[in-house]
Amino acid sequence: MSEDLRPSGDITTALIKNNKKIKAKIISNQNCVIGGLSFAKEAFKYSDKKINFKTKTKDGKKIKKGKVVAVVCGKAKAILKSERVALNFLSLISGVATITKKFVDKVKGKSCKICCTRKTSPNLRSIQKYGVKLGGGLNHRFNLSDEILIKDNHIAVDGNIKEIVRHAVKNKKGKKITVEVDNLNQFKKIMGLKFDRVLFDNMNIKNLKRGV
C-alpha cells in the first residue's frame, strides 16, 4: 500500500466529495484457480478497518468466468484507494495457481511432481510459492540454505563436477543434494555418488530419456 500512497496519498480519490458507503463486487474475468483472498482483504482493511470483505469462494477453488469472488462494503474513498493493490494480489496469486494447475493436470496419474524454483520476483517469493501450492504444485527450496543445489555455474568455477559432489556429500549435514547436469557425460561422471536428485538442464528429449 505504501507504494501507492507515498508521498501524498491518493490525490485523485481525494477529489470526490461524496464519500458514501458503497458495495463493490470482485468478479473473475476468466476460468481460474482462485488465490489471494486473504491478501486482498488485508489490503482493504489497511485502507479502512471498517470495510466488510465477504468472500464467495475459497483459495484453491476452480471458478468460472463471471463468478463473484468477493463483495466489498464500505466508504467509497477507502475502497477506491485500495482496490488496485487488492486486485494485484488476487491476479498474481490466482495466475500462478492457474498455470500450475494446468501442468499438474498434464501429469496426473504419472509418477511426476510439479515443483517451483527460486526464480521469483524480489520480496514476493512466499506469495508466489503459495500460488504454486494452491495449484497443486510443490515448493522446491525457499532459499539457499534449504538444500544443496550444485548448478552449472558452481561447476564452471570449481572445474570438477565429481569432486564438488563428493565434497557436498561429506558436508551435507542432513540437507538434500541436487546436481544439475548439462549433458550425459557429466551425468556419467557422478553416477554412483550419494546425491539425492539430478536436474537435467536444457537437454533434448532423446538425451533426457536416456538420462532417466
Predicted regions and their residues:
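Acidic/glycine-rich phosphate/pyrophosphate-binding loops and surrounding catalytic core
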Residues: M1-L193, R197, K209-R210
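Short secondary-structure boundary segments
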Residues: N202
